Amino acid sequence: PFFFNDTATTEIYTLSLHDALPISGAGKKSFVAGADIGEMSTLTPEEGEAFGKKGNDVFRKIETFPIPVIAAVNGFALGGGNEICMSCDIRICSDNAIFGQPEAGLGITPGFGGTQRLARIIAPGLAKEIIYSTKNIDAAKAKEVGLVNEVYTQDELLPAAEKLANKIAKNAPIAVRACKKAINEGLDLPMDEAIVVEEKLFGSCFKTHDQIEGMEAFLTKRKEKNFINA
């Protein structure tokens, strides 16, 4: 997973003018390889904690990236591969995708957010079963339990991710970014506090170029819109 290291995520942040970012593995066998077991095998407790923090810092950058990130999962997404997948806003996969957290069989816990994100995305009881038993789930099961939104053939996967990114890109970037911020921040708050977050972000959209452009286009029945994220 450290393909997405600090340098890589910093470079990704330079793409912030884009409206959505699909990510996928190279090839059809795996989405992202997990951490190097040989490297981890000699870590001390302090080094293990630091290793986990390194991964979590990277994955949080993806999770809090200003624009929507779409994971197009092809093949295996195990351990860190599943954890980076869960850091993305939207997950779709190919019909050969396999998801799982094998860490307990190695004598460790998931270390890059797996215990926290999986239990927030799917039912906590099922998340516990997957983590405790180290069982893998296939693409059909992943869709059934809400880990992914859709399943495609291997050839359809990347075009589907690009199509979804383009569909998102047709909307006002300033609004989409505010929606992401509202959802992500609100999930960690009591409802009364979360509603206040939404109200503030809702208000922040008014008198922006994109709000004026979007509403003018609607009122005049103009199809073309010139959104500029401002």
Regions found by a protein language model. Give the residues of each.
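Well-ordered beta-strand positions
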Residues: 19, 90, 129, 133-135, ...
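Terminal low-complexity tails and localization/encapsulation signals of metabolic enzymes
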Residues: 216-230
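CoA-thioester-processing core
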Residues: 58, 62-64, 72, 78-132, ...
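A structural preference for short, pocket-lining loop segments at secondary-structure junctions
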Residues: 16-43, 61-72, 90, 94-98, ...
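C-terminal long alpha-helix characteristic of the crotonase
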Residues: 92-97, 139, 148-196, 204, ...
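Positively charged, low-complexity/disordered segments
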Residues: 1-19
